[in-house]
């Protein structure tokens, strides 16, 4: 993509951490419980539907007791997450903050959780075109089936320009950071020929609503 490309870049800051909702946690595949760990009051998670209220069980030599499975994030608490890179591998760490107390919940491979979300939500564009996941995530889509040179922006049809507006809106209103590189080669037999590379902050893709918006844009010219 060395020539004839159109670029939309928002050089904001990739967030160190981000707040999430219960619907996001459920999409990741977890229930949130209030109970005790080794007799101490705590919040913790288990896989959706795996544990029940009143249940005692052991993990890693520690005893867990579930007093109540939460239907929403408690009003005095925040569900937070961040991406860390350790020995070349990304991890999603998430925890619950209740006033001055922090309850670690899990540390997981973000690639596994994102795949789980995208499969559950049927976000096939994200599943098909993801290329790399770290602090940022790269998508690459090559939909060029003709021999041609990229067209200048002035020759883009209205539908293509609408896609670019949608990308700007995502960067401005939802992620604050992003880089979208686009080449358009024209329309042949009602098929748009284009190539794109899109970089977004990974944390935002754990938000179910944002993931749906990104998937929609990736498929707008198909």
UniProtKB/Swiss-Prot annotation:
This is UPF0128 protein PYRAB08320. HAMAP family: UPF0128. Belongs to the UPF0128 family. Transmembrane segments: none annotated. It comes from Pyrococcus abyssi (strain GE5 / Orsay). Coiled coil: none annotated. It holds the Pfam family UPF0128.
